């Protein structure tokens, strides 16, 4: 998708001096064709236009182990890609009553899949790249499980929306101990 590459190039140009890094989300089920960018070929094109800033690439939980392994190998060997974010919303985990709706499923039911993907990634990246975990982290216990699985950082979203800022403070405090 050449249009996406041009969009990222424009984003880098306009924000490079304003930010410390970028998360390139090529995993959203809400944007038609975006998940097609989850390829080594696209990562190589991204490297070619990447600024001298931290760049993490966000992947979907629905990738096969083989596909994720190829992407992680590319990230591990890259001098321009800082790491990855695992995982975004899922189309496969959708509840039956929501199957016909657009978008993806996030929250609690995503946790086990995300935890598994984080474990795979930690083994592949061997601490050489930054691994950010997200997906179903709705408690301190789950945040700690992500860290034990190999995540360097833990991101939350759905739990923050429903539990508020206090949740973030509680999790951050537990992870700091």
Task: Tell me what each language-model feature is.
Residues 1-23, 28:
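Active-site beta->alpha loop and helix N-cap motifs at the rims of alpha/beta catalytic domains
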Residues 21-23, 54-58, 81-85, 130-132, ...:
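Structural preference for beta-strand elements that scaffold enzyme active sites
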Residues 51-63, 121-133:
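Short beta-strand/loop segments at the ligand-binding rim of alpha/beta enzyme cores
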Residues 26-38, 68-127, 167:
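Glycine/Thr-rich beta-alpha phosphate-binding loop at enzyme active sites
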Residues 12-18, 47-51, 74-79:
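Acidic (Asp/Glu)-rich catalytic clusters
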Residues 63-78, 122-127, 137-154:
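Catalytic cores of alpha/beta
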Residues 26-28, 83-90, 141-170:
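Glycine-rich phosphate-binding active-site loops on the catalytic face of alpha/beta enzymes
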Residues 1-9, 35-37, 56-77:
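Active-site glycine- and acidic-residue-rich loops that bind
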